């Protein structure tokens, strides 16, 4: 086995490119530990008893600074603590995601001549893979071999996770094959690591294949494995396969969690299967799986999409009663639902509640309100909301301007829209084709067809291409003025530019 591992390791190292000197972990001569200045025998005794007391009490609730302080006490203790104690501490710091710190502390241990265990090296390998470049992981793998350690499945799974972290999918797949070739039996962590990576990068067929292999290789998937697949399938619209997986995991007595249910609920909402989403929510509650902010957000969004606004509001308040507090996205979703249904005052009530609860409205929230007021024929109030934005740390973006301009034009306030458009041009704002199309339409409504066509022609010099809506708007403007020849010429140019006319061109 050792020989096959060594051969496999050699081929893995060959796959790395950038072996630079600065990336290598230096393992110094243990004798240099003698040069470290210590503070005397009494200090050693105090430090020794102090760190032992902390270790006895457990490291679960240890804060980062306390962990560093504990390491300092441990290295100043005499005799030095066992490598098991050091390994436990490194593991705790690694769980805090302070990977560079773990690597640095390990280097200090090497200087002090504290010989590591294989599990110590595996913790460091995990940290190297999540904080550094591939070449450093290769270097550390070589150091492990020099120290006499034969990398095990945990080592290679960490390296596999590193490849996934660096988005090197082909290398991850190749390493997985090498792991099999070296005689290792991948466990659920190894499989799940690669499956999650494949799903994230939309290689779903390969991920499903790998999932099916697990049973034949004697590795049982867990809820994390299922969640990776369910989420990946839902993201590409394969909700039927995802629902089958949910049934499969329940048959195997693997309990789905909030991530499993939320992925499917969100997928059902997106494909218009609101009833199925609500049924799944009820199953979730019956199984005592508590919804989170994402679950509630998906359901509220679905209810708003179907105009079930009072039910959406009930779900919103139920969420609060259950101790799950809405964020600005959920507030905005509900406000948008009310505004879209012309219930702007109800939307404003939610907006005021949002402010009272200390949730800060963002640019999208204000844009939704502006659109709502324009929709109910109150463009002046919409402009008041617009004017408040900058002072409330939610500066308007191009979409906000477009919504306001469109609302003003649709409500007969074209001159005001033109003034705002002129202001945007003077400020050299990043005006897009939607903005120009709105203004061209507004000009045509005012009878300023020549000005509209001048603006239309200027688009090409600005490096901006009209879309089918821009063409249709301009053609309609010509037709309303009886300029049939000009409309026909523009219609031909539209087809030359590769745009297929829509039904509004023929009206």
Swiss-Prot record:
Chief subcellular location: mitochondrion
Chain ranges passing through the membrane: none
PROSITE patterns according to UniProt: PPR
Residue range covered by the transit peptide: 1-48
Gene3D superfamilies found in the cross-reference section: Tetratricopeptide repeat domain
PPR repeats: 47-81, 82-116, 117-151, 152-186, 187-221, 222-256, 257-291, 292-326, 327-361, 362-396, 397-431, 432-466, 467-501
Pfam family, one: PPR_2
UniProt xrefs under InterPro entries: Pentatricopeptide_rpt, TPR-like_helical_dom_sf
Residue ranges the record marks as coiled coil: none
Keywords linked to the UniProt accession: Mitochondrion, Repeat, Transit peptide
One GO CC term on file: mitochondrion
Organism superkingdom: Eukaryota
Compartments, record wording: Mitochondrion
Family according to the record: Belongs to the PPR family. P subfamily.
The protein's name: Putative pentatricopeptide repeat-containing protein At3g16710, mitochondrial
Species classification: Eukaryota, Viridiplantae, Streptophyta, Embryophyta, Tracheophyta
């Amino acid at each position: 086995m050792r020989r096959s591992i060594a051969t496999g390791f050699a081929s893995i190292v060959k796959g790395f490119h950038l072996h630079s000197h600065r990336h290598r972990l230096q393992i110094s001569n243990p004798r240099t530990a003698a040069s470290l200045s210590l503070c005397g025998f009494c200090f050693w005794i105090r430090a020794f008893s102090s760190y032992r007391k902390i270790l006895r009490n457990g490291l679960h609730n240890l804060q980062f600074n306390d962990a560093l302080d504990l390491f300092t006490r441990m290295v100043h203790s005499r005799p030095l603590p066992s490598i098991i104690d050091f390994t436990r501490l490194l593991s705790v710091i690694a769980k805090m995601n302070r990977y560079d710190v773990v690597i640095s502390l390990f280097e200090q241990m090497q200087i002090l001549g504290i010989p590591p265990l294989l599990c110590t090296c595996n913790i460091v390998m995990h940290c190297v893979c999540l904080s550094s470049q591939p070449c450093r992981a290769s270097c550390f793998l070589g150091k492990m071999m020099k120290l006499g350690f034969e990398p095990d499945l945990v080592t290679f799974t960490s390296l596999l996770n590193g490849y996934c972290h660096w988005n090197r999918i082909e290398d991850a797949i190749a390493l997985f094959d090498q792991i099999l070739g070296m005689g290792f039996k991948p466990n659920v962590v190894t499989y799940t690591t690669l499956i999650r990576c494949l799903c994230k990068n939309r290689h779903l067929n390969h991920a499903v294949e790998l999932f099916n292999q697990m049973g034949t290789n004697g590795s049982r998937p867990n809820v994390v494995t299922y969640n990776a697949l369910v989420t990946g399938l839902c993201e590409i619209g394969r909700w039927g396969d995802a629902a089958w997986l949910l049934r499969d995991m329940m048959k195997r007595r693997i309990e789905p969690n909030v991530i499993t249910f939320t992925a499917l609920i969100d997928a059902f909402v997106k494909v218009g299967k609101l009833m199925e989403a609500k049924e799944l929510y009820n199953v979730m509650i019956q199984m005592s799986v508590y919804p989170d902010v994402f679950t509630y957000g998906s359901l509220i969004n679905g209810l708003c999409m179907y105009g079930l606004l009072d039910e959406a509001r009930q779900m919103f308040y139920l969420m609060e009663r259950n101790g799950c507090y809405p964020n600005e996205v959920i507030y905005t979703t509900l406000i948008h639902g009310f505004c879209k249904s012309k219930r702007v005052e109800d939307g404003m009530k939610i907006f005021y509640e949002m402010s009272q609860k200390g949730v800060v409205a963002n640019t999208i929230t204000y844009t939704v309100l502006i659109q709502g007021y324009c929709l109910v024929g109150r463009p002046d109030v919409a402009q008041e909301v617009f004017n408040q934005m900058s002072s409330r740390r939610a500066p308007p973006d191009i979409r906000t301007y477009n919504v306001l301009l469109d609302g003003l034009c649709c409500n007969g306030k074209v001159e005001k829209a033109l003034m705002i458009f002129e202001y945007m041009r003077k400020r050299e704002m990043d005006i897009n084709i939607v903005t120009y199309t709105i203004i061209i339409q507004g000009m045509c409504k005012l009878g300023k067809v020549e000005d509209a066509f001048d603006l239309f022609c200027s688009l090409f010099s600005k490096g901006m291409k009209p879309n089918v809506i821009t063409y249709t708007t301009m053609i309609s403007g010509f037709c309303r003025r009886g300029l049939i020849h000009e409309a026909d010429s523009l219609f031909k140019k539209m087809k030359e530019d590769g745009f297929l006319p829509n039904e509004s061109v023929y009206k």
